[in-house]
């Protein structure tokens, strides 16, 4: 959520910044919300005047009673003033609802470093690590390798649940689990994160706090009988752990690493990477979440990207980093980097991690603040998160990049102690 004061004081600047944001968003609603806020502010001034008048009239009652005077008219005036205050309070509550409805649907303001552009083709590559894997044979796709090696069962996943669900079997299940453990060990022992194992279901307030609701409700899986939502990412429960809290400034930054299953309806994604493990309704991921002071957040974003890189480098997987353009930035981020791993069967890089700085956008929605001393006025924290990284896509990348001509797959050195083998065959 944006700062309403900023909308009032920098209206045209904000409208310009949001005009090519890539969201289905009409900048004219900013004028609407400002008009509603002005109306609310005028009524609040009237309410304060009425309360002052009521206090003055109220003070007259004991004086008149003491003097033996009739207070009937004064009491009637009190009731009239009270009725006006009640009516104005109702108007303010109605205006608050209208303002909040609009504010929850206004996207974040892009950082000046965000490139211009409309689609993912306009994202700017800023780094490559490793070289795309070359083969002296025709490489297989990960879904064929997984099936041939009896690691992945797409058919039975479809039978028990539906399309875009997968059963991991035998060494495939062990590979998934080994990657999870490797990522968590790397981030907690080497990168300084505290591990969290969060709930996989959250309430509506949590989904609103991180920005999934109200805009993206159609992409969420909802438990209809009690209002819970299955989490699309551990970002949601981990960020909302601190909802409506004021943190101690000297404890920042707070850094959490969380493994979870993730659940996404992926509405509108038909035909896009729907074969194999790339786009699933249920998948595992290790998420990195940070809470920091505003002046720390862009340095912490750089470190977050490096932490996500570290696990891919440890696995020897070639990747590149792109800075996301305005039109592809999404709803909540002020600045975002995607890390894309090389996938031989696609002959291109495929996203495996997104690392974002939300500045105070989520903190305002979730009311997460900090202060450096007990007497200091609380300020909103900045929140960041990044995939550290997606597990299923890592499985796919390992199968494709480490495959051998005979159809076997070499285990990356970093995973051998977890897998207790050197080769999948």
UniProtKB/Swiss-Prot annotation:
One Gene Ontology cellular component annotation held by this UniProt entry: cytoplasm
Catalytic activity: tRNA(Ser) + L-serine + ATP = L-seryl-tRNA(Ser) + AMP + diphosphate + H(+); tRNA(Sec) + L-serine + ATP = L-seryl-tRNA(Sec) + AMP + diphosphate + H(+)
GO molecular function, one term: catalytic activity, acting on a protein
Stored InterPro entries: aa-tRNA-synt_IIb (IPR002314), aa-tRNA-synth_II (IPR006195), aa-tRNA-synth_II/BPL/LPL (IPR045864), Ser-tRNA-ligase_type_1 (IPR002317), Ser-tRNA-synth_1_N (IPR015866), SerRS_1_N_sf (IPR042103), SerRS_core (IPR033729), tRNA-bd_arm (IPR010978)
Positions that bind ATP: 264-266, 351-354
Record PROSITE patterns: AA_TRNA_LIGASE_II (PS50862)
Residues at which L-serine binds: 233-235, 287, 387
Enzyme class at the top of the EC tree: ligase
Comment on protein domains: Consists of two distinct domains, a catalytic core and a N-terminal extension that is involved in tRNA binding.
Binding partners and assembly: Homodimer. The tRNA molecule binds across the dimer.
Protein name as catalogued: Serine--tRNA ligase
Top-level taxonomy: Bacteria, Bacillati, Bacillota, Clostridia, Eubacteriales
Gene name, Swiss-Prot/TrEMBL: serS
């Amino acid at each position: 959520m944006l700062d309403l004061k900023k909308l009032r004081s920098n209206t045209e600047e904000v409208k310009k910044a949001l005009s090519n944001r890539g969201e289905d968003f009409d900048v004219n609603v900013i004028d609407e919300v400002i008009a509603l806020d002005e109306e609310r502010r005028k009524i609040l001034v009237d309410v304060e005047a009425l309360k002052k008048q009521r206090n003055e009239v109220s003070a007259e009652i004991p004086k008149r009673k003491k003097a033996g005077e009739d207070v009937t008219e004064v009491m009637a005036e009190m009731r009239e003033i009270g009725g006006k205050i009640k009516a104005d309070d109702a108007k303010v509550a109605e205006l608050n609802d209208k303002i909040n409805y609009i504010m929850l649907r206004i996207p974040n303001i892009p950082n000046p470093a965000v490139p211009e552009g409309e689609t993912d083709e306009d994202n700017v590559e800023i780094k490559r690590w490793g070289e795309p894997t070359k083969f002296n044979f025709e490489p297989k796709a990960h879904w064929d390798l997984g099936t041939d090696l009896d690691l992945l069962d797409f058919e039975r996943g479809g039978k028990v649940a539906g399309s875009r669900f997968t059963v991991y079997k035998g060494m495939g299940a062990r590979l998934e689990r080994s990657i999870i453990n490797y990522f968590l060990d790397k981030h907690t022992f080497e990168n300084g994160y505290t591990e969290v194992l969060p709930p996989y279901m959250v309430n509506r307030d949590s989904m609103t706090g991180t920005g999934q609701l109200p805009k993206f409700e159609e992409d969420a899986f909802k438990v209809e009988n009690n209002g819970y939502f299955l989490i699309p990412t551990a970002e949601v429960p981990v960020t909302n752990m601190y909802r409506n809290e004021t943190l101690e400034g000297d404890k920042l930054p707070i850094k959490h690493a969380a493994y979870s299953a993730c659940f996404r309806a992926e509405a509108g994604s038909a035909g896009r990477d729907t074969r194999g493990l790339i786009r699933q309704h249920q998948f595992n991921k290790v998420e990195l979440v940070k809470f920091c002071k505003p002046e720390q957040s862009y340095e912490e974003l750089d470190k977050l990207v490096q932490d996500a890189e570290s696990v891919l480098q440890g696995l020897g997987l070639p990747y590149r980093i792109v800075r996301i353009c305005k039109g592809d930035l999404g709803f909540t981020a002020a600045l975002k980097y995607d890390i894309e791993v090389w996938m031989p069967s696609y002959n291109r890089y495929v996203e495996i991690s997104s690392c974002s700085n939300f500045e105070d956008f989520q903190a305002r929605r979730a009311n997460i603040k900090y202060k450096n001393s007990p007497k200091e006025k609380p300020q909103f924290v900045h929140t960041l998160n990044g995939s550290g990284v997606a597990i299923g896509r890592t499985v796919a990348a390992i199968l494709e990049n480490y495959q051998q001509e005979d159809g076997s797959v070499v285990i990356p050195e970093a995973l051998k102690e977890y897998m207790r083998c050197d080769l999948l065959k």
